[in-house]
């Protein structure tokens, strides 16, 4: 397709997306009147300060890009939502609309954070919009973040079709469960590449059953950046339907793509696989998981991967009888191997120096608004002092510990991470080792007699040569409740 025809195709896709959103919006209003639903609200005030020029590591990372880089900042959030129904209905839907005012030393601005509508018919889901998503096998509250997808970057507008939650297949006792689907969307930051497109699909299998104490889980993920207008000689990248099929199949680009894209694959592709084991005992729940990524080669099953030394390994132990220490987590992250230091391995085979989250064509890499979409320990460009837009530190080793629990009416969370940072293979073999210790203590309490609010305090600490020495304090006040109920 010509560039003009390709843009016509993209405009048609966007218009159809808007049409679907409007259709669901109209349906939502009729559903509210017909069935009756509870609409909830939340107001949140979050303010922090720190001893250096930026906020501590765990203050600003894995926060969906909502916390500014600056040391002193305040966010005022407002959210309206309708949650998923508790009962298993044939049809269900949920939506969220949220925004915030961000105030810092450098700027103040109004941000639209989430705006999406999700509908489910039987086991199938369809959603449109921007939403906070949790993807992967890692722990949701204590993890350092998934390897390919974490909670680090701002949501982007996407369309999803698929089976969102694990669904029994053939067996009534849930012996075999599956989930999977496909996302397509747009990067909205426009940092380097204009109108960059997003593609992501996944498939997971879980074996065990409701009567078994052991569950095994395995999943595959494929994500890609494609299309867009690249500055300089490369210019407009192809975005026709044939190009989308090539991206979907991870095949070489069309004749309109760059020569390297034609030889390799069209776009920037990252594959991931993960495995998880869950063990349920009388007093404990134990979960162990592993994640790996592949940047320029097909995924090899588990231990056959060329970069098998790289990955995220984690284990959690949940205590059912002692709430003071309710859950403990340990994770080890390694990304130093990257299939070796040389892309030209032997003059025939090419595949080393994977340089995770970087790409020669899309130089902003696997990021959105200056933050990595995957693990935050592959350092986000927002930390780059020279204002470069790419990843300057993607060879890391991390030991991460998390603990959470309750004491009377207080709940707490502790994160502690120790990292070794080696930069990228472009620094090899003269790389400079930089270390860092990053800690977070968070305590929250619900005050029913004080306007029914939740108050939380946080203390963050950074120490070392990677992110510097820094101490921060944060205060959070939130109030949530029922906005209205339609019978």
Where are these regions (language model features)?
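Transmembrane beta-strand segments of Gram-negative outer membrane beta-barrel proteins
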Residues: 35-76, 86-97, 178-184, 455
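Short loop/turn motifs that connect adjacent beta-strands in outer-membrane beta-barrel proteins
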Residues: 35-40, 82-94, 120-124, 166-179, ...
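Internal, well-ordered domain-core segments that constitute the primary functional module
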Residues: 136-236
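Residues on the lipid-exposed face of transmembrane beta-strands in outer-membrane beta-barrel proteins
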Residues: 76-84, 115-119, 128, 159-165, ...
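Surface-exposed loop and membrane-interface regions of Gram-negative outer-membrane beta-barrel proteins
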Residues: 89-121, 133-152
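Bacterial Sec-dependent N-terminal signal peptides
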Residues: 1-39, 477, 483-487
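Transmembrane beta-strands of outer-membrane beta-barrel pores
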Residues: 45-53, 82-84, 99-105, 121-123, ...
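Outer-membrane beta-barrel pore domains
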Residues: 260-272, 280-487
């Amino acid at each position: 397709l010509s560039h003009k025809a390709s843009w016509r195709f993209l405009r048609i896709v966007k218009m159809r997306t808007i049409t679907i959103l409007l259709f669901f919006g109209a349906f939502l209003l009729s559903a509210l009147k017909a069935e009756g639903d509870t609409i909830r609200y939340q107001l949140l005030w979050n303010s922090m300060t720190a001893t250096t020029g930026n906020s501590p590591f765990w203050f600003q990372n894995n926060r969906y890009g909502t916390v500014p880089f600056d040391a002193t900042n305040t966010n005022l959030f407002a959210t309206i939502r309708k949650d998923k129904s508790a009962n298993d209905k044939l049809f269900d839907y949920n939506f969220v609309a949220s925004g915030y005012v961000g105030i810092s030393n450098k700027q103040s601005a109004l941000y639209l954070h989430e705006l999406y509508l999700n509908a489910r018919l039987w086991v199938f889901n369809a959603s449109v919009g921007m939403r906070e998503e949790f993807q992967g096998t890692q722990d949701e509250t204590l993890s350092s973040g998934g390897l390919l997808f974490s909670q680090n970057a701002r949501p982007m507008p996407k369309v999803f079709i698929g089976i969102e939650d694990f669904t029994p297949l053939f067996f009534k006792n849930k012996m075999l469960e599956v989930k999977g689907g496909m996302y397509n969307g747009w990067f909205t930051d426009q940092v380097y590449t204009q109108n960059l497109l997003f593609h992501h699909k996944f498939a997971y299998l879980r074996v065990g059953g409701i009567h078994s104490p052991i569950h095994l889980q395995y999943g595959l993920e494929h994500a890609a950046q494609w299309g867009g207008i690249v500055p300089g000689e490369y210019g407009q990248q192809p975005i026709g339907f044939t190009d989308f099929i090539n991206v979907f199949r991870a095949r070489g680009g069309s004749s309109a793509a760059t020569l390297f894209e034609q030889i390799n694959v069209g776009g920037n592709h990252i594959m991931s696989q993960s495995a998880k084991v869950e063990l349920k005992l009388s007093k404990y729940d134990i979960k162990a998981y592993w994640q790996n990524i592949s940047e320029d080669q097909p995924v090899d099953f588990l231990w056959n991967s060329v970069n098998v030394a790289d990955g995220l390994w984690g284990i959690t132990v949940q205590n059912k009888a002692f709430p003071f220490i309710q859950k403990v987590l340990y994770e080890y992250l390694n990304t130093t191997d990257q299939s070796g230091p040389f892309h030209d391995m032997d003059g025939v085979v090419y595949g080393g120096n994977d340089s995770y989250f970087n790409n020669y064509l899309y130089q902003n890499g696997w990021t959105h608004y200056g933050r990595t979409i995957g693990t935050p320990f592959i350092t986000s460009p927002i930390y780059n002092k020279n204002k470069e837009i790419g990843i300057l530190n993607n060879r890391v080793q991390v030991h991460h510990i998390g603990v959470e629990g309750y004491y009377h009416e207080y709940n707490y969370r502790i994160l502690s991470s120790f990292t070794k940072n080696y930069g990228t293979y472009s620094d090899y073999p003269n790389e400079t080792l930089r270390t860092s210790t990053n800690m977070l203590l968070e305590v929250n309490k619900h005050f029913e007699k004080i306007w029914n609010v939740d108050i939380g305090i946080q203390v963050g600490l950074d120490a070392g040569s990677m992110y510097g020495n820094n101490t921060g304090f944060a205060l959070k006040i939130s109030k949530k409740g029922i906005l209205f109920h339609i019978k």
